[in-house]
Amino acid sequence: MKKYIKEQIKKSFEIKQTIYENENLINKIEEVSKLCVALYRGDKKTILAGNGGSAADAQHIAAELVGRYGFDRPSIPSLALTTDTSCLTAIGNDYGYDNVFSRQLEGMGQAGDIFIGISTSGNSKNIINAFISAKKKGITTVALVGRDGGEMAKMADVALVVPSDSTPRIQESHILIGHIICDIIEKEIFGDGVN
């Protein structure tokens, strides 16, 4: 069993090493970080969504921004579309599950906001529909995905594609990327910045 545990830890290291060496992905993480910093300086918000583990990641990232990531500072506006069960079930019942996020974006999203859709496959229909709604409202779209990026990577203004086919490794990498972005936002707006 110990050997298996070590193999899993090693696999986690390996995908992070791949990300570390992927200059294109590093540049895109920097691009999204800069977009978010500019967004917050302009009084806008990030909106996030995902399904299953990706829903948990959306909530986690939003909580780091609204609460705090590394130090005490004013709250940063961020919203996960996965938290309101009444809204999710009403929209799911009346419009279908494929529209649970797009309908919320129609009501709460504003031009200049950023929508971050999270999916390990990049093919979640409800996130794809949310991208369509976001584009109509002038909301910048970011895909945080894995595998080949799927349809979401093709549709997004910026696609952060974790180069792996393993759902657990993709999810681990998504939260790493989310944490890096939160850290940069916090330090750029309320700290001494990042080199």
UniProtKB/Swiss-Prot annotation:
Q: Per its Swiss-Prot or TrEMBL entry, what cofactor is needed?
A: Zn(2+)
Homology family: Belongs to the SIS family. GmhA subfamily.
Q: Which GO terms describe its molecular function?
A: carbohydrate derivative binding; D-sedoheptulose 7-phosphate isomerase activity; zinc ion binding
Q: Under which name does UniProt file this protein?
A: Phosphoheptose isomerase
| Note from the entry | The reaction produces a racemic mixture of D-glycero-alpha-D-manno-heptose 7-phosphate and D-glycero-beta-D-manno-heptose 7-phosphate.
Query: Which Gene3D superfamilies does the record match to this protein?
Result: Glucose-6-phosphate isomerase like protein, domain 1
The GO cellular component terms are:
cytoplasm
- Reactions catalysed according to its record: 2 D-sedoheptulose 7-phosphate = D-glycero-alpha-D-manno-heptose 7-phosphate + D-glycero-beta-D-manno-heptose 7-phosphate
What's noted on cofactor binding?
Binds 1 zinc ion per subunit.
Task: Answer whether the UniProt record assigns the keyword Methyltransferase to this protein.
Answer: no
Q: Which PANTHER family match?
A: DNAA INITIATOR-ASSOCIATING PROTEIN DIAA, SEDOHEPTULOSE 7-PHOSPHATE ISOMERASE / DNAA INITIATOR-ASSOCIATING FACTOR FOR REPLICATION INITIATION
Q: In which pathway does it act?
A: Carbohydrate biosynthesis; D-glycero-D-manno-heptose 7-phosphate biosynthesis; D-glycero-alpha-D-manno-heptose 7-phosphate and D-glycero-beta-D-manno-heptose 7-phosphate from sedoheptulose 7-phosphate: step 1/1
In UniProt terms, what function does this protein have?
Catalyzes the isomerization of sedoheptulose 7-phosphate in D-glycero-D-manno-heptose 7-phosphate.
EC numbers: 5.3.1.28
Please list the residues that bind Zn(2+): H60, E64, Q171, H179
